[in-house]
Curated annotation (Swiss-Prot):
One of its GO terms (molecular function) is ATP binding. Gene3D superfamilies: 3.30.70.270, Trypsin-like serine proteases (2.40.10.10). It comes from Ovine astrovirus 1. It catalyses: RNA(n) + a ribonucleoside 5'-triphosphate = RNA(n+1) + diphosphate. Residues 105-144, 579-635 form a coiled coil. Keywords: ATP-binding, Coiled coil, Covalent protein-RNA linkage, Host membrane, Hydrolase, Membrane, Nucleotide-binding, Nucleotidyltransferase, Phosphoprotein, Protease, RNA-directed RNA polymerase, Serine protease, Transferase, Transmembrane, Transmembrane helix, Viral RNA replication. Its EC number is 3.4.21.-, 2.7.7.48. One of its GO terms (biological process) is viral translational frameshifting. Residues 687-699 have a biased composition (Acidic residues). Residues 1085-1217 form the RdRp catalytic domain. This is Non-structural polyprotein 1AB.
Amino acid sequence: MNVYDKVLQFGSKKARARGMALNKLSRNRLEDIYAGSGPLVFGFGPIDMVDPGSLNPSIKTLDTVYVAAVQPDNQYVVHHFVPGRNEWVETDASTHQPTALVGVLVQDHKAKTREVEDLKSQLSQLRMEHEILRHEYERLKLKSPIVKPFKPLKVLLFSLLLGLLFAGVTNGARTGTCYAYDEEKDTCLYWEWKDSREVAWYDSYVTEALAIYNRACVYVRSKEFMTYLSLVFQTVFNWYFCATALAVYYMARAENPIVMFVTLALATLSQFQLLAVAVLPLLDFSATMGLWLSMVVFYMSQQISILVSFCVLVLSVMIGTFMADSEYAMMIKGHAVVFAIVCYSHVAMILNIPPWVVSLTMVCYRLWRVCFVFPAERLEIRSADGKVLHTVPTHPNWTAKVTRFVQSLRKGLRTSVAPTARIVPDGIAIVEAREGVGTCFRVKNNLVTSKHVVGSDDAVKIRWGAQEDMARVTYRHPTKDIALMALPTNLQTMPAYKFAKAITDGPIVMTAFDEANLLLVAVTEGVRVEDHMTYSVATRNGMSGAPITTVDGRVIAVHQTNTGFTGGAVIFVPEDIPEVRKISKREQELEDRVKQLEGMLNMDQAYVDSNLIVDLVREAVQREMKVLRTELANLGGFSQKKKGKNKSTKRKRKAVWTEEEYKAMLEKGFTRDQLRIMADAIRDQYYDDEDEQSEEEAGYPDWSDPGDSTDIENEWFGYEQSWKELEPAKSGVVVNTLPKDLVFKYSLDNYPISKQDIQAVAKELKIYEKAISDIISTSVSTDGKWKDDVDAQKILQELDGLWWGINHTLWEHGLMPFTQRRKRVQQPKKLQRGPEDPGPEECKLDYWEQLVEPSKEKFLVPPEYPLLGVVPLDRPISDFDAPVDNLLALLPEPESPDLGFEPAVWGPEAYVKSFEKFDFADPDPNIEKNYPREWAFANLVLHREFDFLADSVVKDITATSKNSESTPGFPKTYWWKTEAEYLAKRGYADYVSEWNRIRGGARPNVLWYLFLKKEILKSTKVRDADIRQIICSDPIFARIGCCFEEDQNERMKRRTKTRMPQCGWSPFFGGFNDRIQRLVAKGNPYWIEFDWTRYDGTIPSQIFKHIKNFRFSMLAKEYQTPELRNMYHWYVDNILRRYVCMPSGEITIQHKGNPSGQVSTTMDNNLVNVFLQAFEYAYLHPEKSMDELRKDWESYDSLIYGDDRLTTSPSVPNDYVTRVVAMYKDIFGMWVKPEKVKVSHSPVGLSFCGFVITHQDGQYLPVPAEEAKLLASLLRPTKKLENMDALYGKLLCYRILNHNLPNDNKFRNYILVALEVMARHYSSRGEEPPFYVTESMLDKLWRGGPKFDYG
């Protein structure tokens, strides 16, 4: 099995050989069961089987093979082979000491090996990061300014060079007349100086310049033009000016300009001039020295200079033979260039070639070389295997060291933009321990921080804002630097982080406190290395334990290291939080004893040679294991039964409640039968057989080798299971089965049928299938319910009879009945997929048009709507799932099971009916023109109510916020389930490209996906298939809308206290009372509760378009450009004229209403609501002027949320209800039911947002308006709850909602009793409820601060 098992081979050799032989026959293999485990131990032991040779069924004990080992999780596991089933089955048996101890050591060795590999990987990663950071530090390090010291030699050389250059330029000479001349001595005997000096260069240049100017004006096309042009070149390429500029430049910028000064001086004296400077990049050090020597000799004798340069060239050829090829080639090339320019200068002197011609020649040569020849700047010296040994430059410009200052001009370029991220600023707290300070955050009901922060403390101090409390350390992770603390009661309102679905490389966010309690946020790139996350952040003390989150705010790791600049974190996943289980006193004592034993073992192992491990196992722990076995045998729960004690005993009925509790529950209204049912449910769920048996449980024997292997073989291979026991038995009890599950229960589609089955009973199988199909089709409707005239019990009895008959037929033919066969697991249907790698074309908004195919048959599209075609989409259409939550059995039964509400279920007809919300009445075709007074007043109120939207901004599409866990729409649903997956794969590239494409003039048609909403509805609506439809657009289209409207939406959410719209409000902490008091302060005599029916579906298009135009007009002027205006009009047009895709793939068009899936549905409904209220007030008061309407509106106020409205008005007509219902129908085509309009003189009794207003103790407090709907969502939910904690939390939410109800309210009392019952359930499990709230806490939650004595 593994190297340890091959060497040690614990147990019986016979059992090992037999076990290996049986392993080949087994359906599951030991290689899979004990993969990665330590050494195995084989042995023989008994197993109880049915005796096949007895007429009456009896139990016979056989010998079988037992195998045991320690698995990777350090669990000692035992399996034995079960004949007949041919399978290794896990069981219990006594522990084989050597196997257990060696196995633990093996697993510990593997864990240490993995840890070492992890540390090596981390070390390698840290070394790489250190090198990168060191390089970055050197690049970014601010260099101190260099103060060049004063060098007299440099200044002296520069002065001499300038004097030499100006001396040559000025050509100054004094003139005079010689009156006596000695021809023999060639000397003037008498010379008379003139009084003035002539400046040769000044006069000649001025004269030549004037001559050139005059001749150019007169003779621009003459032959003499080229002559004057040559004079211009002579001026431009003058050596003295070039040399002077070069000297000044090197004097100002170069660190050591002496080399250049010497070259310029020698070039001036020797008349080499520009030649000497031009060839410097081609010369190495020896060639440069040769050039200087040649120029010095050239000044004295040109012929000797040629000879000297040639000798130096020959000498370098001979001496350089010992050098490397690359260096030798560069040196020879440099000296050859020196010899060439010496010869060239001599020829230029003889032919009297002007210096400017030489300069022009050199400039042309360099220009030609730059433009047409690209010589290599470096040579790579490689070995025979291609490895680069070193690199040498082809132009050894050793003087380039003087121009190193150019490198300071290099700047780093920004190559990326940090993404925007979501943080939870109040989601972290400060943890203070004896060993230091850190940061912690909440996950579920735990506070999480680094293990090194809490150290060895059992309790630490937590500071969250102004609140301080002590938290108990409950868990320290064994391998990760993570510690968990219990959440204190005072911190229950602290926001909790959620886990990320995937942890990948990319942008991460760190939110932490430093040691000065300052909130710090960092966004950077993170790289995952196995169980760690590495990143570069300037971390500080106190940041340990901070959450590392994605840009969506989901936690992925816990910050743990602080090196001053680099940061590291340990990955944090849900599996790192242990399951909480209360440890009994007996288990704690046993655990302490085992730890004591392990400590003794570790002490002994420090002195043992690794080669003597077997002796260590046998000798070192033999005494301690005997003591431990004796103690375990003396414990009642762990003691073994004596051999033969196999009779089971009847369990004792355990009392659930005390007598006082039982009487108290009777007084609360429970009947005795209800309490008996609840007690049985508690016993069935939490009954522990081990604790209730009156006799000792049977154990398994120690390992032993049987004496005769022949007996074992006879027992094994002569065994057959008794066929009589497999005979199907006909049950007299009919199990109540839901009609929608009949096919799954009685059909044979999910059972394996062999060839032998078909040969034996093919006719019977065919008859059975036909009978089952006929019964189900005639008894069950298409929506999965019993038909009205069907007796369900009779049908189920008939089906059970057929099921028993077909199974008994198989048994009679010697075939395995279906009741003994394993049903095939129904795999979920795979959705149709698109191309494997969608490109930018598939992600465009109008790509769906390429997938449309023609179709004429309507299925889900209503008759009056067009069918444009179908796309390849096959999604579930019907939903008859009404979940049955087993956890609800823990709750008491309500007084009335018929609540009038139930979960929405639907068939195909519900889709057709959902379109009726668009068709109530036709609005006036031109409301603005036919009602100008009302329209003008409504528009005036609209601007006044939403004046704070002025100068709103257009956001970048990558900075918008939207629920990314929503559907990506069609056709992106082919490749991604949510927009988050789409963004993770493609990023924002498609968003930006589509934005630019539409801004550039493209106008694609957007497809909306339609589905029905699963929610609690009135039973009458469910029966009438009146289900709400939701439509969602492509996420790119939705985020384009967010660009224009997200800033305005956020502004409206921040002004719920002073304005009408209440999207974003909170009724807690006095919020409900504050808003009602705001309306009461107006002092109006009239209060109106108003509600539309099918509000958003009947909004007239002209009203909706006017609201959208108003929103665009409130943007800042810089955003109201023609291209953005046209783009916004395209966005609005795609909302009003929508291409809708049904789950069947059908495509139709909707022309009315505000779709309930766009990003601003509620905000737009609020704007429309305000506009309609103002129009309504002006319409119902035709006698008032515009000034009077404005004055009345000062005392008019409302609270609105979509179509919900609570209004206080200074005046209401007598026939208000009749007139307002008619107005909305005739003018706007909207549906207002008279019973949905209530007029009152007090707000008490009216409702808003599902709350009825009450007045208690001087405050307006809310109570639930539909208690039956809330109770139905508890007892008949739309989906199952995860566990008891979720059920308790849901009950607690209802407890908060009904806090303000009267004490005799039935719904309130039911929730209180249910919470008490759940507390009993927790108590019976030895646990405490996860939450607890008091009356004073709820009073403060609803009423607010201490001014009402509730703070």
